[in-house]
Amino acid sequence: MKSWSAQAASHRSSCAIILSVCIATFGRGDVIAETLDSIVDQLQDEVELVIVDGASPDDTKQIVAHYVERYPNVRYVREATNSGVDEDYDKTVGYARGRYCWLMPDDDLMRPGAIARVLEAIKEDHELILVEAEVRILDFSKVLEKSRTGIAEDRRYGPGDAEQLFTDMGDHLTFIGSVIIRRDVWQRRNREMYFGSLFIHVGVIFQQPAIESALFIAEPQVTIRFGNANWTSRTFEIWMFLWPELIHSFPDFSAPAKMLVVDPEPWRNMMMLLKNRAKGRYSLSEHKLFLRRRGSVLDRCRSFLIGLVPASLANFIAVLYVVTLMRNSRLGLYDLLDSNSATWASHWLARTFPLAGDDDMYSGSRET
């Protein structure tokens, strides 16, 4: 006679998997356990967790092994080499057995009840489900944004709503953890052309044929750990070039719709360059690498001069601007204070003119 555990395992294996939570990870041994802890107790017989490790050099394998041993619906695949985030997420969908795949980051948290809410939404049989997310600081102790989109109620998109979906959700889709997509939809679309874009999910969603049925869940289902992205060192390149080039590459959306998502050439905007200088993401190194031969003579001179502005001065001015004129920008203030460009003067400003409810906002970021 089979033991109870053997019977339970047999029952799980015989259940059709409805939802696969798909994580692509690399070198996140310091944080991935928190992410897994937020997921595993929500797993049900018809839900699995698939983790693809792109050859992490740290202790990720040993950490995940504990979860594989304890939870039958957790699967771990370690690749021999790192193929990049896009290809690794594509692999997670390939390994998945669920009808739907939730593309989950390896450092954020799934909110309590999230899987149950998504399983309920799956009953509507949409091709695509997108979920709202809240944003918190690195240790999750403070909320920076309660909602990334500001949309208060669930929204449904049908045939003919592709451009509305694009404008409503384009910016939100910079966060891959918002995406739950039907696996057959993902598999029959061109993914290879988006390898290296860092946003394979966006390419899959907005290529032709258009998504004809989508749902946006307005209640946050994920908590984002702000400032912990693997791509932090490439921030300027990503937001000035890779992201806008991807958005403006889609031929089936109007130019005004694309502009609502992102400017095609944000690097031409002097205020955008100053903001990046204030956050320590733009310097003469980026000018030399990306802008020295780009644009008009005026563009080149302007970008060069901005690179000469002391980063600490740019940061102080930016913090002053936020605490006096943008007092709802909690995330913007935290981002500035968390920068290496922030000095005691910037932190003094934040303490002296705190945003509403944020008297200790400066204490959650680094201070020099």
Write out the residue ranges for each language-model feature.
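Nucleotide-sugar donor-binding/catalytic module of glycosyltransferases
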Residues: 2-245
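C-terminal subregions of glycosyltransferases and related glycan-biosynthesis enzymes
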Residues: 203-206, 210, 216-368
